[in-house]
Amino acid sequence: MPHSDELDAGNVLAVENLNIAFMQDQQKIAAVRNLSFSLQRGETLAIVGESGSGKSVTALALMRLLEQAGGLVQCDKMLLRRRSRDVIELSEQSAAQMRHVRGADMAMIFQEPMTSLNPVFTVGEQIAESIRLHQNASREEAMVEAKRMLDQVRIPEAQTILSRYSHQLSGGMRQRVMIAMALSCRPAVLIADEPTTALDVTIQAQILQLIKVLQKEMSMGVIFITHDMGVVAEIADRVLVMYQGEAVETGTVEQIFHAPQHPYTRALLAAVPQLGAMKGLDYPRRFPLISLEHPAKQEPPIEQKTVVDGEPVLRVRNLVTRFPLRSGLLNRVTREVHAVEKVSFDLWPGETLSLVGESGSGKSTTGRALLRLVESQGGEIIFNGQRIDTLSPGKLQALRRDIQFIFQDPYASLDPRQTIGDSIIEPLRVHGLLPGKDAAARVAWLLERVGLLPEHAWRYPHEFSGGQRQRICIARALALNPKVIIADEAVSALDVSIRGQIINLLLDLQRDFGIAYLFISHDMAVVERISHRVAVMYLGQIVEIGSRCAVFENPQHPYTRKLLAAVPVAEPSRQRPQRVLLSDDLPSNIHLRGEEVAAVSLQCVGPGHYVAQPQSEYAFMRR
């Protein structure tokens, strides 16, 4: 039955009275209630709200993916205008018909790329599969188009990446592959669920511009789900604000930012961290917590000094980590990824040192190498006077009680067969620290500290939103009262209010227990708020390191200035520069086996502030 007369000529999507529920303990739990919206051709609708507000399940309902997970979906109308201009009712489509709609007419970029990519197929095969299915292209044509899409999302060495597997890529690289796959068939509607969460600010800025360019070319409608109000200001035409499963406010981006009507919208905007807010302050500062009842922003008191003078708790010297690349008929190692090259730094008790840089710069690999989750090929890692890099497996296991890791992808780091209570208790059991009754009380306390309920201990990972899963991972890392926590994008998946709560929790624990943090992040506004010192990484090497004040208020290296300039600002009227989207000029950290890369030489430009020397900087930036 044709539905063209039911959809306005300019619209590509219309939803009326969408209701979503899940069954739990024989009870129906409502996730979304009476949600209605439309999307015009060439328009970007941003759906914003806290974790668990119903944003992602709304997107999954549109894609007809919720029924498989036990979701109950009811809707008066869910109309889509396909690329062929035919209008279909999505709720009436069979599973076979939806397979032709997904990808070709409506594509989705998922929040967690590691769980969305198939680990047994190469990147090229996965992108090409979608192109062959929906565009009737040959294998050769599909691979050429796949390479072109990787170029468009600014992946260096795109030809090489085509033959790599998802586990061989960084989180940001995987997210860019997901974006390339979703855009490869030029759909009528693109649903982007936190598509730039795992990306550094420079790549995020380029991806946002890329989506806008392709949107203009194809008159594509975009639903952009995010918690980053800076991104909303940069990309959205209209904004839909959700709270506890309901739409509380909708309007143009200018109306929402300049004249918000609902208290929750005002609270969301007040909670956005602003780059430059820490100017003149020496120590990290807690985030102001905004609630629906008290939306007015009140700055928290200034923090006290937590860094303990004396010997560093962690000392890293000339750390080198490389990954082999095989090729040829004999599958020999011919090239290597120089992920980390001669990195050195110290970390003191009670200090937060942030590692920042683009995806693939070596931040996460550095963090993993410290715990020997990846093996290093050179350098020294010393914890409390003891060499980590030479420890036996048995002694290393005991040491991991004192150094904990919070991973970037929360779903991939939780066992789907275990309740979250069991996942949090597991490290306590492994180290024999607490009996069952005390361990259960510890789990309840940890869940409350990260903003969850004690009864959540009996649920499984798939029953939580992405932000809630990240909070579970943080609770697990805190279970053993470690001396050092390596946090790899630990708050990147969280909305602004929960992110503030978690950062405040980390600062409280640092103040109470003297925990040292190695904070790996691409969110410069959060880094500015939490850090004592900042190290900027580029192609596996540190090019600038110093106090937070020095790096943010007086950046010396061109790359540091580039990172700061790319940070999205929560002001829709701000003029934004156009960015070049070509990837041919991107440098690469892949080199022939045995080839040595010159280490940058750092020079002191101020107290504790070191920057790559100009003579080595030019060669380094060009490589």
From Swiss-Prot:
- Please write the reaction equations for the catalytic activity of this protein: glutathione(out) + ATP + H2O = glutathione(in) + ADP + phosphate + H(+)
InterPro entries cross-referenced by the UniProt entry: AAA+_ATPase, ABC_transp_ATP-bind, ABC_transporter-like_ATP-bd, ABC_transporter-like_CS, Oligopep_ABC_C, P-loop_NTPase
Give the Gene3D superfamilies listed for this entry: P-loop containing nucleotide triphosphate hydrolases
Q: Which domain of life is it from?
A: Bacteria
Keywords, ordered alphabetically: ATP-binding, Cell inner membrane, Cell membrane, Hydrolase, Membrane, Nucleotide-binding, Repeat, Translocase, Transport
Q: How does it sit in the membrane?
A: Peripheral membrane protein
Q: Which GO terms describe its cellular component?
A: plasma membrane
Listed Pfam families:
ABC_tran, oligo_HPY
Residues folding into a coiled coil are none
Q: Where in the cell is it found?
A: Cell inner membrane
Outline what the protein does.
Part of the ABC transporter complex GsiABCD involved in glutathione import. Responsible for energy coupling to the transport system.
**Record's family?**
Belongs to the ABC transporter superfamily. Glutathione importer (TC 3.A.1.5.11) family.
What protein is this chain from?
Answer: Glutathione import ATP-binding protein GsiA
Q: What is the lineage of its organism?
A: Bacteria, Pseudomonadati, Pseudomonadota, Gammaproteobacteria, Enterobacterales
Q: Which gene encodes it?
A: gsiA
